Amino acid sequence: MGEPSKEEYKIQCFDAETQQLLKTALKDPGAVDLEKVANVIVDHSLQDSVFSKEAGRMCYAIIQAESKQAGQSVFRRGLLNRLQQEYQTREQLRARSLQGWVCYVTFICNIFDYLRVNNMPMMALVNPVYDCLFRLAQPDSLSKEEEVDCLVLQLHRVGEQLEKMNGQRMDELFVLIRDGFLLPAGLSSLAQLLLLEIIEFRAAGWKTTPAAHKYYYSEVSD
């Protein structure tokens, strides 16, 4: 599998100077301030929902390049520190900007999906990711379609990996999701459909059956 071209990392959304910084970080990480690079990537991920879905791949590539070049992990440390800072103020972020909060959850799940230690997901990210998903499964979040959409998308992406790391918390999360599905009011029909789909997706071993795919995707397109 060849390395993706730099353009595939969707860095065109940055100004020319930042694009150059990111390109250098990918090719010659020792030549740039990698903590600054980590902050640039996190800042942009909180504002750009498309980039937040892509950034994990770029972060993984920079970590690999730095490890190969210098055997160090300055970038990874900077990235995890910044993720932790945002995690600690996540309620304030959600209150300030729902889009920023949804982007943060997308980003941390993306990082969890891509970053590996000895071929395993990073234990340090398991509980923060779960905490974010638990927050999305609270009644006040389930009344907002953007948050339901985010919850379901992230469970499609990392649910199976998360369950392997901590099955008990996944059971608890799905109790909340099932309770939310039965909320008497405040849930849109699309939100109900999405929650039912993810409940069935997990019950089928994190797979979509052909019948379910046909049913849900015809409903959503209608």
From Swiss-Prot:
It is found in: Cytoplasm; Nucleus. Residues 3-205 form the MIF4G domain. One of its GO terms (biological process) is regulation of translational initiation. One of its GO terms (molecular function) is translation activator activity. Signal peptide: none annotated. Keywords: Cytoplasm, Nucleus, Translation regulation. It comes from the Eukaryota. InterPro entries: ARM-type_fold (IPR016024), MIF4G-like_typ-3 (IPR003890), mRNA_TranslReg/HistoneTransl (IPR051367). One of its GO terms (cellular component) is cytosol. Belongs to the MIF4GD family. This is MIF4G domain-containing protein. It comes from Bos taurus (Bovine). The lineage of its organism: Eukaryota, Metazoa, Chordata, Craniata, Vertebrata.
